[in-house]
């Protein structure tokens, strides 16, 4: 009996297992069909995406090819423009050499007054006597009014019209620095201040030695009694005027012949701030022009704009002070020409420097009637720009390169 029951159970289990297997196989087949359908869809989508990607790639390659052609065309146009500008600069230089500026001849004011007095005396005599002044005994007509012209030293009335040439002399020292001549003397010596803080000045006998020398071995070294700060120093009439590195920004007058301090002064300027937005190491910039020494500075009281002061080179006293409309922001350097402050601006990512603000102490010119003057493109940003009034050139330090800029001047009357 037990054996019969066992056989019945075995048959029943076998039947159930067969049914489950059939159901399972049917389920598996259904899932496989779904997967095959999805794989087919993915394959179609992949083919479509691959085609779109291929088309996009071809479009990008075509655009890059066109961009490269345009770039090459622009480069050729730029080269042609540079050639034309160079040719134009040479022609302008040639015209300037062929047509030198005429000498300035003026009649002395005292002689003019004497001329007027004699003329009035003559008219009065003729009115009283009724006869011409030439009939006066012992008096000749040629004694009257024939006053020869007297050549006088012309007053400074020039303004910058353009930068006509740029000369790169060499690369020396740090990215910031200063190089200059004696701006009031007749010496050919070149004075080099390497860095924005140091105590040693390098002196080369002439421009040739400075240009050809690859080191400071041929230079004489002057060790100053106090270190300097910034690049706002100047050599003027045998003396070095430099800013001492301390909290008061003391101006030191140092005689280069006997290597001694002649005088020193703390300028009457309170709460100083960097005068140039792109040259944070400069708090005071001493410059020179045809009229003497000037100080360019900035204070917290007028922290947005640059200030200007006239400096007495003998006593280091301030003669007069001005607040200018020239902003500090994006200014990299400045200089004075004929009593006018020219501020040079740039961008934080260095581009072409430009004179974009002019302040004249006499009020005869302003930024509105002076065109923007651009400097040729160069390496970085100017850490110093020193105007030489005798040469009409700017000695510039550009990211470690020593450069000369030649200026073209014109009379202020030509602006109006």
Curated annotation (Swiss-Prot):
Coiled coil start-end: 48-129
Olfactomedin-like domain location: 155-411
Compartments where located: Secreted
GO cellular component: extracellular region
Disulphide connectivity of cysteines: 156-338
InterPro entries listed in its UniProt record: Gal_Oxase/kelch_b-propeller (IPR011043), Olfac-like_dom (IPR003112), Olfactomedin-like_domain (IPR050605)
Broad class of where this protein is predominantly found: secreted
Family matches, as Pfam families: OLF (PF02191)
Signal peptide (UniProt feature, chain positions): 1-18
Keyword Nuclease in annotation: no
Sugar-modified residues: 198, 258
Keywords: Coiled coil, Developmental protein, Disulfide bond, Glycoprotein, Secreted, Signal
Description of how the protein assembles with itself and partners: Interacts (via coiled coil domain) with BMP1 and (via olfactomedin-like domain) CHRD.
Stated family: Belongs to the OLFML3 family.
Known role: Secreted scaffold protein that plays an essential role in dorsoventral patterning during early development. Stabilizes axial formation by restricting chordin (CHRD) activity on the dorsal side. Acts by facilitating the association between the tolloid protease BMP1 and its substrate chordin (CHRD), leading to enhance chordin (CHRD) degradation by BMP1.
PANTHER family referenced in this protein's UniProt entry, alphabetically: OLFACTOMEDIN-LIKE PROTEIN 3, OLFACTOMEDIN-RELATED
Protein name: Olfactomedin-like protein 3
Species in which this protein is naturally found: Xenopus tropicalis (Western clawed frog)
Source taxonomy: Eukaryota, Metazoa, Chordata, Craniata, Vertebrata
């Amino acid at each position: 009996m037990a054996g019969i029951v066992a056989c019945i159970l075995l048959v029943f289990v076998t039947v159930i297992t067969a049914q489950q297997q059939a159901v399972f196989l049917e389920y598996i087949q259904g899932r496989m069909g779904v997967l095959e359908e999805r794989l087919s869809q993915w394959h179609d989508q992949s083919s479509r995406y691959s085609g779109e990607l291929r088309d996009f790639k071809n479009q990008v390659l075509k655009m890059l090819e066109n961009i490269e052609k345009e770039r090459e065309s622009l480069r050729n146009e730029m080269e042609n423009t540079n050639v034309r500008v160079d040719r134009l600069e040479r022609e302008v230089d040639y015209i300037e050499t062929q047509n030198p500026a005429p000498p300035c001849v003026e009649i002395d004011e005292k002689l003019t007054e004497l001329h007027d007095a004699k003329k009035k005396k003559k008219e009065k005599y003729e009115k009283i006597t009724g006869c011409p002044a030439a009939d006066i005994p012992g008096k000749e007509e040629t004694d009257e009014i024939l006053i020869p012209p007297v050549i006088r030293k012309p007053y400074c009335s020039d303004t910058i019209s353009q930068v006509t040439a740029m000369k790169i002399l060499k690369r020396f020292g740090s990215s910031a620095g200063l190089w200059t001549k004696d701006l009031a003397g007749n010496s050919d010596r070149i004075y080099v201040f390497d860095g924005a803080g140091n105590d040693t000045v390098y002196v080369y006998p002439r421009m040739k030695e400075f240009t050809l020398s690859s080191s400071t071995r041929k230079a004489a070294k002057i060790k100053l009694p106090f270190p300097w700060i910034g690049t706002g120093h100047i050599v003027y009439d045998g003396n070095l005027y430099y800013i001492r590195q301390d909290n008061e920004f003391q101006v030191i007058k140092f005689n280069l012949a006997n290597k001694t301090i002649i005088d020193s002064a703390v300028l009457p300027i309170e709460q100083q701030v960097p005068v140039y937005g792109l040259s944070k190491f400069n708090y005071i910039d001493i410059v020179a022009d045809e009229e003497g020494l000037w100080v360019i500075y900035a204070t917290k009281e007028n922290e947005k704009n640059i200030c200007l002061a006239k400096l007495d080179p003998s006593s280091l006293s301030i003669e007069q002070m001005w607040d200018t409309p020239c902003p500090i922001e994006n200014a990299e350097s400045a200089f004075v020409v004929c009593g006018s402050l020219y501020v040079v601006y740039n961008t934080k990512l260095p581009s072409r420097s430009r004179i974009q603000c002019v302040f004249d102490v006499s009020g005869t010119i302003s930024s509105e009637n002076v065109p923007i003057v651009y400097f040729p493109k160069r390496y970085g940003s100017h850490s110093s720009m020193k105007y030489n009034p005798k040469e009409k050139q700017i000695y510039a330090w550009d990211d470690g390169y020593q450069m000369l800029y030649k200026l073209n001047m014109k009379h202020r009357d030509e602006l109006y």
